[in-house]
Structure formats: structure tokens, C-alpha cells
Amino acid sequence: MANLLKTVVTGCSCPFLSNLGSCKVLPGKKNFLRAFHTHRILWCKAPVKPGIPYKQLTVGVPKEIFQNEKRVALSPAGVQALVKQGFNVVVESGAGEASKFSDDHYRAAGAQIQGAKEVLASDLVVKVRAPMLNPTLGIHEADLLKTSGTLISFIYPAQNPDLLNKLSKRNTTVLAMDQVPRVTIAQGYDALSSMANIAGYKAVVLAANHFGRFFTGQITAAGKVPPAKILIVGGGVAGLASAGAAKSMGAIVRGFDTRAAALEQFKSLGAEPLEVDLKESGEGQGGYAKEMSKEFIEAEMKLFAQQCKEVDILISTALIPGKKAPILFNKEMIESMKEGSVVVDLAAEAGGNFETTKPGELYVHKGITHIGYTDLPSRMATQASTLYSNNITKLLKAISPDKDNFYFEVKDDFDFGTMGHVIRGTVVMKDGQVIFPAPTPKNIPQGAPVKQKTVAELEAEKAATITPFRKTMTSASVYTAGLTGILGLGIAAPNLAFSQMVTTFGLAGIVGYHTVWGVTPALHSPLMSVTNAISGLTAVGGLVLMGGHLYPSTTSQGLAALATFISSVNIAGGFLVTQRMLDMFKRPTDPPEYNYLYLLPAGTFVGGYLASLYSGYNIEQIMYLGSGLCCVGALAGLSTQGTARLGNALGMIGVAGGLAATLGGLKPCPELLAQMSGAMALGGTIGLTIAKRIQISDLPQLVAAFHSLVGLAAVLTCIAEYIIEYPHFATDAAANLTKIVAYLGTYIGGVTFSGSLVAYGKLQGILKSAPLLLPGRHLLNAGLLAASVGGIIPFMMDPSFTTGITCLGSVSALSAVMGVTLTAAIGGADMPVVITVLNSYSGWALCAEGFLLNNNLLTIVGALIGSSGAILSYIMCVAMNRSLANVILGGYGTTSTAGGKPMEISGTHTEINLDNAIDMIREANSIIITPGYGLCAAKAQYPIADLVKMLSEQGKKVRFGIHPVAGRMPGQLNVLLAEAGVPYDIVLEMDEINHDFPDTDLVLVIGANDTVNSAAQEDPNSIIAGMPVLEVWKSKQVIVMKRSLGVGYAAVDNPIFYKPNTAMLLGDAKKTCDALQAKVRESYQK
């Protein structure tokens, strides 16, 4: 049956059977139906391909007849490509001779050699120049084209309407090579760019040939030869080709264009981009520049006039599609050039950019050589023909990708950047109908957004607006205010003792300023700890005011005893914690130390004083001087690791000498001395116990707690001093000064006390670390400040004791509340600044005690601590690019934040597992680890230290990069790493290591976010804009170890998570570090 059916089908002449395909015959599936379903086959038709088979088409390559035209449309290689595709190719005899392609080359490639008429009658004719009158044949080339044939050539349809009319009469389909859209997909067929590239290169070669000097500068025995200066106008393909060629020949190259992108390309080639002062975008359509405004052109002319007097060679390429080339250089400009200069006008064919250009000619005008050739590509005919041939063959394959038939479809509905766009833009005539210009494509991409200026650029612009006068005036105003204040203090001084105390305070502040700046950042934590211990000299104030016998007998004496007790906690605990931290920085290779020998100067200092006291000498002031100098030495000793332990020893000596001199000056009775000793001994024992048990990771909260003790001691001392001195106020000339200092010291101490307690609660986890933003908190704080300041009025005006003690009690309460509201509004990540500010407050409170008691030691030490805390606060704020007021008032945003909409982050992140991370670590030779607070919170320093040790033993260069505000107090991460045994010489600060990231194979970011956030540099609208950060993204590979992709404290998305060189290793930091350590150890043991 099947054979019968095939016979019927084969012999049937019925039309619906004529295209019968060889489909499979399908039998029925039910047993009782034994028929075949033949109707499916009877109606099946094979698809018919559109177009004409390549083997039926002939491509003709005529000889170019335009004057001096040496190019040919197809090279032998191009012919070979078309023959391989299936085309028949005929070439006019001698068509390629001027391009060094002989007829034999074409024959070898598979072409036939024929006459002009036969070639032009081909189905598809490819040319360089548009058809023109053939003088030899006496007929126009368009009239020799085959009816309904196809022409591919440069046409310039807007300038040649008569030619289009001739071609229309022949029903020709025309593809204009000059109309190929300048889109990414069409770069391989962009003949204009190919020819412009050659023209740009040739322009430099011709200029060098007619210029009388070297392009490159030389210093020879015969003398110095300056380099040639070249200005290139127009940053298109030709201009950039000229810039590259001229730069490679050693010339000084300058480039000008109205388009910002073109100027960037000039810069990338090593040329100096020139701009006018007027900002206006020159971006036009199709990759060309647009016509500019009158104001811009005037500024442009001014720039060109100036450049003409400086440069040796001018090359101009400026064109506007479909219009005459603009005149950019007038006659006066050209004549202002140095004799022997050269100008090359690549726009000569369109009229030229120079007023003095003669298109197609080379001539000299008043000593200036003018090159106005219109056939520069033709002067490199072989290269130009090869590139043009490649453009045509690629275009033919692209528009007709079918392997068998030549066919392309012209559509008026097409998307931007597609082949439909290329075909519709290139075809200017279809079957004799002019369809030029092409309609606007759909989905036209928006122009590139204006490049957002970086934070550094905006800062530079901002700095540039500050004139030298304004800068100097600001500086002069500061000095004027300072000197005026000093004069005011002198006038207000009640006695000589006050003036001497101000002198001591000023000099101590200057010494402290210069001393603290010398402290290495790695030792900022020990610095704060030692200043905390030294601030315990508030005990001196307590000792001076203590009284009674074995027990205090009055309220003031009780307050003084309590101040002495809590100050002693600070002294003992502070020095022991400092010693513990410094011992952690010791390396196994360090030489042995014999610090116990510093007992010798300590014994000499204190013992010598006791001996002199026993001998009847009163040298307390000299002892205070010696103690103060030792405290200065304590801070100075922390400038290096080698002298840090000496600094701690000097601090102990200074405090011990100060306490001894105080006791010696007081000469207490045995009972009172026992009371004093008991208070200090009990406080010291408690301080030592706390310091011995505290974990180093809990150091920030310990420092905060100790600061609260200093603040409380200052409040107690000031109130006690007021109570004791009150009976003498009526006869004391300095009574008002004493009252002012007592009031001020109480206020500072109250803020320090409560603020430190809140900071302790946040750091210890008792309170939430998130900022507590009370409604109207700024008004509340302003009210508290006004009430505190206003309270001094009745305090000074009313001489009664009740009013005075009430005012002191009120300011104590108000300042304590203000300390709470201020500190509660500050988030946990800003605690480094809070602690340093509180450290500074404690110093100023100590200064207030010094003025109150007329004690030089307290004034000197207070100035040291106050300046130390102030400088550390400044360092922290600079590290965040924020003002101190912004941090203290619980604000957000840096001083560089522009205030606009933040940059949107797009893209996807890459996640890896432990095995991937191990592979990356093993392959890297240079590794930088950048830890953040997450390392502290997870206590992952020990596995990281072990990992670093293993990697170092394998010969890898491993270092740490520490941000100044990483952690919860200055230098905390340095101490934690030292605790784990990491050598301090591989732990570098941000400024020391930032320049090394580009040469680093791998960066491990552990628990850090804001401190490595690239938005600080990339987004001027980010609230962390301008904040100095560790530039980890500049390394070759980055592994970020975090719990999640969540934001950091600043609540800013981090762009580095989505950068192509970043991999996210998500999970708990401690567990991940332990696993990394174990895996690395396992991999190296195999």
C-alpha cells in the first residue's frame, strides 16, 4: 500500500501534490481501523528559501576613474572570500594596479578579468567612489549598471541628488558605505572609520615630511633640539589616529574636542586634552559632534588663537554630517604661527577647517605649509583597499547570513543597534525608490549620563574657591582671637598666681600637643590607658581636701575621701592595663628587657624628696615639676614600640612623685595619713583586681568606666572645695575665680561621669548600641546647656551658701542628664570618638582642679590629657571625614556629602565556599588582611594569627591594614592582634598600606564594611563621601567575610560586594576563620 501511494504521488501532476515531502507514513493506532492517514502527507509543503542562489550572482569590481584615485573596492583576499561564499566575481582589467594588486592576483583568487562595460553590468557592483561620467567610454557609469541591479559604494546621498535620480531610473538598489550606522554591531563594516584611521596616520607622516625639525626632543653634543608641539582638533577616528602616531614619534600632543568622551580618549593616548572655560556638551548623533553655541565658539576661537602662537603643527578633522566643514582657524590665526609650521586639513574635501586651505593642494602661505589633500587614504592605496575590501565582505556576509541564497530585507521598523538598523541605514535606494534618510530606530539608548565627579574632584573644586586672601584672613582672625583672649585673661586675672597658672597651662598644652602627635597610631590604645591612669591624679585634689582623723568628720571631707578612693582605682588599674597591652607587643626576637631597673630613678626621686622633707626643705613645687615632666615623658615614650614600656614606667614615677609631694606638703597627722593611705590602698587594690581580670577585648568599656570615675572625682572635689573655701570668699580677692572654676569643673565632671557610664553600657551590651534619637533632642540639649550656663548667674550674684550649693547641685544634675542625652544619641560605631572626647573632658576637669587648688601638677597633667584626647578626637573625625560636632550631636553624613540622591548599585555578587577561598589563598603570593569590628566581636584574632603564621612560613607576604576607626577605641585592633601574637611590624595603618593594594594578589576583609566602602570615593552623594577608606577593591582579588550582605553602621550599601573581583564568603567570622585555619593547615600538610 505504501509503495502504491508513493507511485501515485510521484506520478501525480495535481498542484497540491507537486511539493510532496518525504514525511513518514503514520498507521492507525486502533486495531479495528486498518486505514492509513495519508492526508497529512498530501498537504505538507517544503519551505521555499527567499533570495537568489549565490552561484547565480556576479559581483563586479570596476576600475576607479576618479582623478588620482588609486584604491580598488575588493582586494584579492576579498575576492577569494566572496568566491568561497559562492559568488561569481569579475574584475575590470587593471582595477587593482594602483593598489599593487595585479590581474594575476585576482585570477589566482578566483575572479575573471573583463572590460568596464561587462563589469558594470554585473548583478552586484562594488565601488569606492560614487558612479561618475566615464570619459573613455563617454557614458555615465550609472547608465551602464544592470537594471534592477545592486550597487555598493560611497554615495553621500544628501550631496548627490542628481546621482540618485540616475540610479533610480535603473531601478537600482544602493547600499551607501558612508551611511553605515555607527553602532557597535557595525564596527566591522564602518568604512568611514577605516579610511579616517588611514587619513589620520598619513596626516602625521606628511606633516613630519614637510616639518623642518625632529618630532622628538633631543639633547646632542651639537645642542638641544626641542620637541615639536602638535595640536589636533577633533577626537574622532582620524584625530585619535593622528594623536597616537604623533605621540609615538615623540611630539608633544594636544587635543581638542567638544565632546567629553573624546577628550578622555585623547588623554588615554598621552595627549594633553584642551578645554574652554565655558561648559557645554558637544555630543551629537551618529558619533559626530554637534554645532555649538555662539558663546562657546567665541571661547573656542580664543583658545585656538592662543594655541596657534605656541604649536608647530596643526591637524584639524572637524566635520558636520551633510554640511560644509566649519572654519575653525581664520587667516590671522594661521599667520600668527611660527614660520616653518605645518597645517594639515583633513576636512579639506568638505571645504576645510582653515580659512587658508586650498582643497586638494599643497602650498606655502607666508611660511606656513598647507596640506589640503582630499585623497589621503588613496595615498596609502594598498592598505586602504585592503581595509575597504574587508568592510564590504563583512557587510555582505552580515546582511545575508544564509549559506545558499543572497537575500536581505529592508524594514522601516527596527530596533537600535540591530542588523535591521544596519541594513535600513545603509540602503539608501530600494529598487529605484529613494528611501534616504532612514527613519528613527526604536529603543534609542539615552545619551551617556554626565560623568559624576568624584569626591576628590569636588573637594579640589571646593578648595580652589578659597582665595589666598580668604585663607590668610581666616588664619589672621584665628591668631587675633587667640591673642585677644590672652589679653582678656591678663586683665581679668585677680592675682599673680592666676597669671602664673595660665602660663603653666598654656605651655603644658603646647607640649602636650606636640608630644601626642608623635605617638604611633598602633599605640593609641596604650596612650589612652596611660592618660587614664595619669588622670587619676584627681586623687591629689582629694588628698588636699581630706580631713578628720581615721574617718572624715564633715561632708566635704567625706566627699574628698571618696574622690581619693575612686581616683586610686584609676591609677592602679590604668597602669596595669597599659603594662599588659605593651607586653603583648613584644616579639620573640626582641632583646630582653630589664624594666625593673627603673625602680632606681623612682626610688631616687621619691626617696630623695622624703629625705629633703625630713631635712626641712620644702621642694613640693619642684617635685610637681619633676612629676609633670615624667608624665610628659610617659606620653612621649609611646611614640615608638621600643620606648613604650619606658613611657609607662615614667608615668608611674610621675604619679608616685606627685602623690608623695602632696602628702609631704600636707604633713598630715598619723590618723589622717592612715585614712589617706587606706582610701588609696583600697582603691588601688580594686583597680589592680579589675585590670588583672579584664579581657583585652573589653578594654574600651574599661576605659569608659575609668573615665566616669575621673568625672565623678572632679565633681566631688569641686563641691568639696566650694564647701571648704566658702567661709573665706568674703575676704578672698580670688573668690569669684574660685567659684567660676568650681562651677566649670563640676559641669565638665558631670558630663564626663554620665557620658562615660552610657558609653560603658553601650560597649558592654547593657544598652543598645544603636543611637537613641529622642524627639527634639537638639532642643533638649540646647535647653540643658542654657540652663547650665544660666545657673552661674545666681551662683555668682548671690553670696549665700544655700544658693551656691544649690547651683552646684543643679549643674551637676543638668550636666549628668546632658551627658546621657548626648552619648545615648551616638551609635556604637562612633564610640572611638566618644571615648577620646571623654578622655579630653577628663583632662580639662583635672585642669579645673588645678586652677581651683592652685596646683601646678594638676594643671600640667590636665593640659596633657586634655590635648591628648582632643588630638585623638581630631584624628578619628578626620578618619571619618566628619566634624566633631556631627559626631557628638549624633549626626550622619560627612563634610563632603553633596546631599543629592545616592548612587544606585546594580549587579550581582559572587559567593564562594571555603574550598574556593582556600584555592585563592594558596594561589596568592601577596595578601593583605583588613579586619573590622566584626573581628573583635567574634574574637577571631587567634585563628587569624595562626593562619598568618602558616602563610608566612610558606613564603607568602602577609600584612594587616588597619583603619583608624576600626574597633571601638583607637588602636583596639592593634592590641587584639598583638594579644594573638601577630608581630606589630606587619600591622600597618591605612596611610601606610593604601598604595600597596594595586600590587596585592588577595585581600581578606574580615568583619569590616564602612571602612572599605568604595562609595566614599565614588559617590559624592553618599553620607560617607570623602571618608578615607582602605582601597581594597584596587587589589586583584577580594574575599569579604561577613554574616550577610547587610549594610554597616552608616547604613550605606557597599559597591565592592558587587565588583567583579570580589567574592563573598558569608558566615560567622569566628567559625569561618577557624575553618580557614584548619583547611589551610590540612592543605599544607598533604
From Swiss-Prot:
Residues 1-43 form a transit peptide. Keywords: Acetylation, Membrane, Mitochondrion, Mitochondrion inner membrane, NAD, NADP, Transit peptide, Translocase, Transmembrane, Transmembrane helix. It is a multi-pass membrane protein. One of its GO terms (biological process) is NADPH regeneration. The chain crosses the membrane at residues 475-493, 501-521, 527-546, 558-578, 596-616, 622-642, 646-666, 672-691, 702-722, 740-760, 778-797, 801-819, 833-853, 857-879. The modification N6-acetyllysine is found at K70, K397. This is NAD(P) transhydrogenase, mitochondrial. NADP(+) binds at residues 933, 965-970, 1007-1011, 1026-1027, 1042-1049, 1068-1069. GO terms for molecular function: identical protein binding; NADP binding; oxidoreductase activity; proton-translocating NAD(P)+ transhydrogenase activity. Residues 723-739 are cytoplasmic. NAD(+) binds at R182, V183, T184, V237, D257, T258, R259, G287, E300, L319. Its EC number is 7.1.1.1. SMART domains: AlaDh_PNT_C (SM01002), AlaDh_PNT_N (SM01003). The keyword Translocase applies. The lineage of its organism: Eukaryota, Metazoa, Chordata, Craniata, Vertebrata.
